[in-house]
């Protein structure tokens, strides 16, 4: 398995595009994206855990209940959530996309992202979709990734390839999300594609398995959005024997999908609103996988810890505090904590107690743009990673001005 270029159009048979249709006032910000495969695709998706769900999720869930789709249509700048006519408009987006592509409306995945509670204007979408379809290309991943952005500062793309059944299988994806990001599918959209031949049931199994290890391990601000969707389409163009059961071929596919999603997870965490640092919390030596995940997420979610990282302050006590209230049955007297970056590693806690370290060295280590928090529980063999970012003054500024 290796990472490659190409994003969501790396896989054979997929095209994508993105344009500005007029939902957003700023003409320099694209706001309508599409992904399409002429070949029929197996389809699967996971959605937000928020009880308040955007209208597009309700429509998409219905459309791919049969495990099939051929296209994705997504707008940014408006969430189409908490609107009386939201479902009607989400369905209309599917109808318009299907008409322009010459496919059935039920073969369209629809998504929206932006401000909650504002009426979604359909006129620019209706006028823009024909132009969007004309723009579709096998080099359109970047345009699509840009068109789904909201407060993101950069488009997020990743792709990988792996050998399955003697064929080269490619998996690619794009994602957005820099605020309202918290474990259990937060304000993020991710659209993945693959030319792997895989049954809808196994594709669904894979997407759930990978989400638990990647997207559900991100937290930026402990807010869970209403519109989160991770959808994947598989058109089988690689020509591998169809994956219909667990085994080596399935494991190879999951490895590639996980690599793509982990890369996108890190890109989202590092692009958190106002963020200056990507934080990676690595927990080892847990008694169970659930313990490892719980501890990692608790630390990465700690507001006080995130603020300390912004200030390059090696306040390891905030790490232990977050572990303590996580609910995980750890033994505090066994916990080791270290910080690591490109500048080196500094050990700050052993067996639950502080040890002497150089504050100057620690500040250098924590001054880098990517920081690892290394936690060893010494209780077992399980491990987990969680991803987040520092908490800065700009986070408040961005969200204070979000609707203006």
Can you say where each PLM-predicted feature lies in the sequence?
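A structural signal for small-residue-enriched, beta-sheet-centric alpha/beta enzyme cores
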Residues: 1-88, 92, 98-404
